[in-house]
């Protein structure tokens, strides 16, 4: 990719149907192993692992959080995520690591390098936000529908298709759960797909007009499209996904990541 991609997906420790605090588990492990680079507070609680990333917990303390080192290659980010998940397992080998959120806030946020995003006009930023959300709908279509429905019922912005943050360096796409880190294949395909569509939107904004027919024009419209995908309205949702697939196949980086994109388009391979 011509830019770096990263993430901070979350997970939970579960043992005998009981959920354990990631902070308590990791703090004990850190004390036992005398881990260095430990951060007790701030946004990134946990510890760093050289050249891989960091492992810790989110502000709620119950959920674990992995922060792989950013890279231009989705395959490298996937490898780092795998190594961090292994490290998380070593913290409590008897527990299962769950990426299914259900009633828990388990986000799978993806970070896209966007150093010039905030320099653009508010109108342009909004168009780009809606374009990314529209093209990312195939990823939502692959998520556990029960998960998505529960997230939707929780209200607020949690799981909202337009949920995003920018900090002058990255654009954080926040609607997804962490299910996409469940297997290396889904993980790499998800990161690559996000890279393909972000490259078209961010590096070639002039192309947005070419596929404007599948881009929501208002916030209400994109949320309506999200509902169609989540509720699987037969021919309507299939038709929408087919149109997105047709346009993405024309994108600059599609051929480079063809296998990954087609993996995302094939729901049967994921569910």
Summary of predicted features, one role per range:
Residues 1-102, 115-271:
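C-terminal accessory/tail domains of diverse enzymes
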């Amino acid at each position: 990719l011509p830019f770096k991609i990263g993430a901070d997906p979350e997970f939970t420790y579960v043992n005998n149907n009981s959920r354990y605090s990631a902070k308590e588990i990791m703090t004990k492990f850190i004390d036992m192993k005398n881990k260095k680079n430990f951060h007790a507070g701030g946004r990134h609680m946990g510890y760093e692992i050289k050249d891989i990333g960091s492992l810790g917990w989110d502000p709620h303390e119950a959920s674990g959080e992995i922060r792989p080192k950013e890279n231009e290659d989705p395959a490298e980010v996937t490898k780092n995520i795998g190594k961090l998940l292994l490290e998380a397992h070593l913290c409590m080998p008897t527990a299962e690591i769950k990426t299914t959120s259900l009633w828990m806030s388990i986000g799978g946020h993806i970070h896209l390098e966007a150093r010039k995003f905030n320099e653009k006009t508010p109108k342009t930023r909004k168009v780009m936000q809606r374009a990314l959300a529209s093209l990312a709908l195939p990823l939502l279509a692959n998520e556990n529908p029960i998960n998505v429905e529960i997230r939707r019922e929780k209200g607020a912005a949690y799981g909202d298709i337009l949920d995003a943050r920018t900090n002058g360096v990255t654009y954080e796409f926040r609607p997804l759960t962490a299910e996409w880190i469940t297997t290396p294949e889904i993980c790499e395909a998800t990161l690559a797909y996000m890279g393909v569509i972000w490259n078209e939107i961010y590096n070639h904004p002039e192309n947005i007009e070419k596929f404007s027919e599948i881009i929501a024009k208002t916030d209400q419209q994109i949320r309506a499209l999200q509902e169609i995908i989540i509720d699987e309205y037969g021919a309507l949702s299939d038709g929408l996904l087919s149109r997105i697939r047709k346009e993405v196949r024309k994108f600059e980086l599609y051929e480079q990541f063809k296998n990954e994109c087609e993996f995302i388009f094939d729901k049967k391979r994921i569910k």
